[in-house]
Amino acid sequence: MLERLKKSLLEAPVFKRGEYDYFIHPITDGVPEIRPDLIREVTANIVRIANLDVDKIVTVEAMGIPIGIVLSILCDIPLVIIRKRKYGLPNEVEISQVTGYSRSQLYLNGINRGDRVIVVDDVISTGGTLQATLDSMELAGAEVMDTVIVVERGNGAELLRSKGYNLKTMVRVKVEGGRVSEVEPGISK
């Protein structure tokens, strides 16, 4: 299961961004190309493991978008994209995002009090983006029914699980020696 994803991660190039070893992969970066068979495998697995009894799918710009769009089409559930640009719409929620290599603001629109949502994204490392996303759902009054992340690395997922969040991941990667050295099954319960 997830053989295409695992193989492609093991083949992913890695470069340094400051002190951070950053792997480049179609699901997490859209580079060199997002192949239909890979995105199909990933989204089919989300359908298999996720609670999709929800009103909306929520994802974060940029690389959560391909996953969210395909999942939205497969499941006929509307998609809300947390954006990097302020729109100034009523009830817009501003989110402070801190990742392993940057700080920025994100903006949530389209979530109403009482909405039942699933959060999907491409990767979790430090957990900063996901923590900000989950906090914004609470501020907006939404109920997060499930959270599914494709690639787990670092300790961010464990940190959020220790805070009581239900977080599913498909694979866990280890990056060392300038390459993705291990790809193990994630936690999908």
UniProtKB/Swiss-Prot annotation:
CDD domains, from UniProt?
A: PRTases_typeI
Protein name, UniProt field? Hypoxanthine/guanine phosphoribosyltransferase
Catalytic activity entry: IMP + diphosphate = hypoxanthine + 5-phospho-alpha-D-ribose 1-diphosphate; GMP + diphosphate = guanine + 5-phospho-alpha-D-ribose 1-diphosphate
User: What PROSITE patterns is this protein classified in?
Assistant: PUR_PYR_PR_TRANSFER (PS00103)
Q: What is its main location?
A: cytoplasm
Cross-referenced HAMAP family, in alphabetical order? Hypx_phosphoribosyltr
Q: Which family does it belong to?
A: Belongs to the purine/pyrimidine phosphoribosyltransferase family. Archaeal HPRT subfamily.
Q: In which pathway does it act?
A: Purine metabolism; IMP biosynthesis via salvage pathway; IMP from hypoxanthine: step 1/1
Stored Pfam families: Pribosyltran
Q: Cite the entry's keywords alphabetically.
A: Cytoplasm, Glycosyltransferase, Purine salvage, Transferase
GO cellular-component terms in the record?
cytoplasm
Out of the domains of life, which is the source? Archaea
> Known EC number(s)?
2.4.2.8
Q: Where in the cell is it found?
A: Cytoplasm
Oligomeric state and interaction partners are given as:
Homodimer.
Q: Which GO terms describe its biological process?
A: IMP salvage; purine ribonucleoside salvage
Q: Name one GO molecular function term.
A: guanine phosphoribosyltransferase activity
Q: Which organism does this record belong to?
A: Methanothrix soehngenii (strain ATCC 5969 / DSM 3671 / JCM 10134 / NBRC 103675 / OCM 69 / GP-6) (Methanosaeta concilii)
Q: What does this protein do?
A: Catalyzes a salvage reaction resulting in the formation of IMP that is energically less costly than de novo synthesis.
Q: Does the keyword Transferase apply?
A: yes
Which InterPro entries does this chain map to?
A: HGPRTase-like, PRibTrfase_dom, PRTase-like, Pur/Pyrimidine_PRTase
